[in-house]
């Protein structure tokens, strides 16, 4: 079976195919409004229609949705008294010493932040239970707000996620639901909340794209490159958009490391310049990961390759 790698950039969509003996490359112009169209065009030009192949894809759909602010209407659910956590953020700010800083828009509008019970203490004990009345109140507000996605981030849910799961079970199946205990089961309600909200905010965009791509290339199995440089099945990627924010650049780093291994150069400085951005990273035998990355104004605590990006 042929292996086909596809990286969608802002300007070009690049293809690399390998049949076990030969390696080939191809390039077409990207189609930003519908990235899957450029992929299908490249497959046709390579003569791979009807040929059995395995597709590994590096995508910028999640990245662009975040940077361009094109997420969907998303409700954020948290515990009583913590609805402003994502707005307050951490002390680290762009203009920390500016006495009159320009205020930034909050990630989530106040009317889309819902507070409820189901609060745990740091040891996992229940501080405040989650009642049926509160669940019904959440459902009523969601019907009024009519979101496409919901992010659920309760205190200390990484210890025990029973209340997050209880809320999820009470929500309509038509909503894209993101639980912080699933997306980033780690300490720190701000970082966990941002990751959970980002996943819900751009998740439907990524899900729709991945499903369209799978239909276009079927029966070829599709895997998507994650920000951590590990691949994930397309159906799983559709649920974990926040793990795809550096999908394309991560694949480039893995390719650079492989070339370094082949020529006996384990220590590399990589420079990946595309039509939209330029990515720079260090490889010291292995691709380095960080949980202190960022995308646009948002900190992203999910594992991702450690690189620096500037405009091209």
Predicted segments with their positions:
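N-terminally biased helix-coil "hinge/interface" segments that flank
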Residues: 1-312
